[in-house]
Amino acid sequence: MATRTGQERVGSELRTTAGWPLTTIVLIHLVISLVHGAAHTGARVSLTPAGAMFVYIVILAGPLAGLGLSRWRPQPGAWLVACSMAGALVFGLINHFIIAGADHVGHVAAAWRSLFGVTAALLIVAEAAGTVIGVRQATRRARRTS
């Protein structure tokens, strides 16, 4: 049963239903990231060990961990999504659009350039949206509990 406050009662447990935007953006980001990873592989654009660790921990695991945490601890979970998405946004902007290197959209093999460039741009949009949604969810919950 839904209530007016964005919560629903499931048995004796009251769950927040306002988390669907967070769930949606995290899943969209994951799909785009996987397609972008395939473009990296196809174009033979490898990352440094530090870059690969950042991708696996911050860009892929961070939003998923935040989403999982948000089920039981909504505010810290939303903050984890927001911070990991913000970190991913900065990483992607710098590596795909600013620094001239193998990971720059203009330096990828021609056969993969379109997919690589489109997914890099979509990641920027998804990560910006994820940052905003995460902050809004976290601060909304903080205001309700104060």
What are these regions (language model features)?
Residues 31-40, 83-102:
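C-terminal TM-helix exit segments that contain a strictly Trp-centered aromatic cap at the helix terminus
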Residues 39-49, 98-105, 133-146:
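Juxtamembrane transmembrane-helix termini
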Residues 67-93:
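Loop-to-transmembrane helix junctions at the membrane interface
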Residues 109-129:
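Individual transmembrane alpha-helices with interfacial aromatic-anchor signatures
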